[in-house]
């Protein structure tokens, strides 16, 4: 008889760890931590351990992942992700998400952006199940363990496929910044259609990005960098920002070193290729 994977074996340490985290996550990810009966006042929550969230490095964006997504942005209940910003009287959100990290991985960029942009709601979108669970547990722990009650309340993650459903979550011109950090390079030519930057997808990004908003890209693969630059430069609604602008921008400084992939490249003394583009005004129709 074929043995069960450790992640599904009821007797394994990883299985027990996941079940325990999952039970806590169901309640804690949708409420204000200090209002939950699961956490006593002053009690610390351990940060999650990556070894218990094993996941393949990449996921096929064209597969049917049975994802949940709203029919339209108006149907999205953001209060479940950002309970601190829900108006207690009318139940409405006091802010909208304005910064998106597409393919956020283990959440390093969001966590560094949170204190840098305390007035903005920041969302990470990640297609892989266990990676999403890890980021959720990481944010729960950070929210609970931070002395300031505002700490990390402005970030969260959801499992979603940005290549298919981005306009289902965001209104026209809602976002001010979009990050594409170390995306899957899809080296084989027949796989290039699965890259996160394509002509078709750029039109969707332009739709949800406000005029003057910025697309940030970074990769350690030169071929992918050239591909992203080529497609963004060819699109009529994007214009590349100068090297001087990149050197002075706070987000670029954070993006270079905040992500887990960025730290890995740094350890290996590899190259990091950055390109930033601004969203141009939509031409008037005469």
From Swiss-Prot:
GO cellular component: nucleoplasm; nucleus; tRNA (m7G46) methyltransferase complex; tRNA methyltransferase complex
InterPro entries named in the record: SAM-dependent_MTases_sf, Trm8_euk, tRNA_(Gua-N-7)_MeTrfase_Trmb
Known catalytic reactions: guanosine(46) in tRNA + S-adenosyl-L-methionine = N(7)-methylguanosine(46) in tRNA + S-adenosyl-L-homocysteine
Active site: 184
Residues modified as Phosphoserine: 7, 59
Keywords tagged on the record: Methyltransferase, Nucleus, Phosphoprotein, RNA-binding, S-adenosyl-L-methionine, Transferase, tRNA processing, tRNA-binding
Record-level GO BP terms: RNA (guanine-N7)-methylation; tRNA (guanine-N7)-methylation; tRNA methylation
Pfam families: Methyltransf_4
Family according to the record: Belongs to the class I-like SAM-binding methyltransferase superfamily. TrmB family.
Other known facts: Present with 2630 molecules/cell in log phase SD medium.
Subunit relationships: Forms a complex with TRM82.
Name of protein: tRNA (guanine-N(7)-)-methyltransferase
